[in-house]
């Protein structure tokens, strides 16, 4: 009987809609399991650290971009169990997103570009909303790299609530990143293009093609409503509530409309008196306010990822760039003759450095409110000239082809890795601000933007390895982790002392990485997740396309 059952289990077991292919191995003890499966004690320890029996919840939740699925993947840490796929730019029949469910169909319609339906996306850089530079867990923002769009996800429901199309960009890579209190969501262009939706030949590249950084204003009180539960809470705090039940579940657009509606029931003077308490207990829905948003014009370099200053550097943001050589389509600056055309990659990598764009976004906000912008495609564009005159826009050389600008928890340092440079560079904001204040500029770029001196702004430079990309911070002061794409490693190093502390081998070709709250004012450390682009020979073969995988590392 046992032999018969075992032979059946070695075949295919079909149960409901699930197919299980494989063998059943019986064991009575850990030692037998270790022996039969060839496991070590370290393997068992790793399994015990990540195993979560039913009912035990994870310590952390990770939001990961789904790439060209157009979704966001949600999984737990340390279990690494997938909890949900959030539908964003792509219809999702299992959840009814975009299929018959009216609200989601309307949200997808918001993503139309020039009247064309675009029901796919390339999700890339998710960002959690923050208060005081720490995650508050209220909203998640995600960009579409292929079609320049940004989506708002409400984490009360883990559902997409808004899609906004960038009216100026034709592509983007550097989004989304939030300022410390989620005043703005930062989105940067990738490939320079004419802002106007019309053809311009490459002969006009320097005059007509532009990059840019958009600051999307986020309004947490875009929609307000009252529930019976919130009315009970208001009553307990001494707020008059007579007549408020008639307002339950009605949505009001913005604070002014909400307070006016409440004032009609309890009196306008009472509504103003208790406004703070009313807003505290109201149900809020945050949305991007496009009419309060603006873009800072940038030269036709290829802008990349960004970060927002915090603490010492709050009010400023930084954005990487590549191709400051201005090789587009293989044509260099002033060179449009086919016979002089260079290989694209060679032309884009000719210089040893590219530029970090340093923006005083609070100064840009003042320019916007003062009307120092022009409308392009119905959107506010602040010219480079206005930014330079306001002492609000600077360039700083950084290692060639950078992909990562990561500001320290105290806001005093920014770490930049150049993909084509083995060094990772640490800049010191005190030095940067001193150069700005003294107007100590090394040069001016062709569009009049002051260029700071790289060496004068540096704190240190460390040789970390081949293909450095992104950096995340540990809870231990000075300790960071940087991904090494070519070496397939994570390097642990001290950015204050400027020395490498160790390296961790990774499965294969790490790209992004994350540590627990590693981009906030108070990193937790504990865990590191390596987001590996390839996983050659690591898993069961599933066809010619190699699977990607996320690798959990204990950094305690």
Model-based region annotation:
Residues 2-13:
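Bacterial N-terminal signal peptides that target proteins for export
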Residues 5-7, 18, 36, 286:
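Short, intrinsically disordered low-complexity segments
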Residues 12-22:
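Bacterial N-terminal signal peptides
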Residues 26-556:
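Predominantly soluble domains enriched in secretory-pathway, periplasmic, or organellar proteins
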